[in-house]
């Protein structure tokens, strides 16, 4: 009986599941992006032409009318390309990117800062300190150091 109910629901709803929706925007080539961290909104509904993301599954480019999806972000650089061609880069420590119908992209991250705000000397010293802490007998200190190392190595690669 339960299987029959599921089959009837599946048959009646199949027509609407999996339908791709497109934006009904004034400019179909514009992607509206929001980049937010818990302590600040870096920008909200900024109109751009493309955003490149450091997804956990690999680098990902997002344009207007992209298929809706949710992606986990790895530590890396979010590149925002405006319609004029100018690009701004932000380092994110991780988070999620939600690509929504209507050519909208919402990026939620724990930390996000302009890439040019970092100096390679500071990164090297922080990385050396984290590597020392990684061999700590205290499991909490070692686990935190492992996370720091992952983020700092990604930051170091992005700055160079």
Swiss-Prot record:
Mainly localized where? mitochondrion
- Please give, as recorded in its UniProt entry, the membrane topology of this protein: Peripheral membrane protein
Q: Record's Gene Ontology CC terms?
A: mitochondrial inner membrane; proton-transporting ATP synthase complex
Query: What range is the organelle transit peptide?
Result: 1-22
Protein location: Mitochondrion inner membrane
Q: Name one GO molecular function term.
A: proton-transporting ATP synthase activity, rotational mechanism
Superkingdom assignment: Eukaryota
**Keywords, sorted A to Z:** ATP synthesis, CF(1), Hydrogen ion transport, Ion transport, Membrane, Mitochondrion, Mitochondrion inner membrane, Transit peptide, Transport
- What is annotated about its quaternary structure and interactions? F-type ATP synthases have 2 components, the catalytic core F(1) and the membrane-embedded component F(0), linked together by a central stalk and a peripheral stalk. The central stalk, also called rotor shaft, is often seen as part of F(1). The peripheral stalk is seen as part of F(0). F(0) contains the membrane channel next to the rotor. F-type ATP synthases form dimers but each monomer functions independently in ATP generation.
Which family does the UniProt entry place this protein in?
Belongs to the ATPase epsilon chain family.
Q: What does this protein do?
A: Mitochondrial membrane ATP synthase (F(1)F(0) ATP synthase or Complex V) produces ATP from ADP in the presence of a proton gradient across the membrane which is generated by electron transport complexes of the respiratory chain. F-type ATP synthases consist of two structural domains, F(1) - containing the extramembraneous catalytic core, and F(0) - containing the membrane proton channel, linked together by a central stalk and a peripheral stalk.
Q: What is this protein called?
A: ATP synthase subunit delta, mitochondrial
């Amino acid at each position: 009986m339960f299987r029959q109910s599921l089959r009837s629901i599946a048959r009646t709803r199949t027509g609407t599941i999996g339908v791709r929706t497109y934006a009904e925007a004034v400019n179909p080539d514009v992607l509206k992006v929001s980049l937010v961290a818990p302590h600040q909104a870096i920008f909200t509904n900024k109109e751009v032409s493309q955003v490149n993301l450091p997804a956990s599954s690999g680098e990902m480019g997002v344009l207007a009318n992209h298929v809706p999806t949710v992606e986990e972000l790895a530590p890396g650089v979010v590149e925002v390309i405006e319609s004029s061609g100018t690009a701004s880069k932000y380092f994110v420590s991780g988070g999620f990117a939600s690509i929504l119908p209507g050519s909208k992209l919402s990026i939620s991250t724990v930390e996000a800062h302009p890439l040019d705000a970092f100096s390679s000397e500071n990164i090297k010293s922080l990385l050396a300190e984290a590597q020392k802490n990684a061999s700590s007998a205290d499991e909490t200190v070692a686990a935190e150091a492992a996370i720091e190392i992952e983020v700092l190595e990604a930051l170091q690669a992005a700055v160079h």
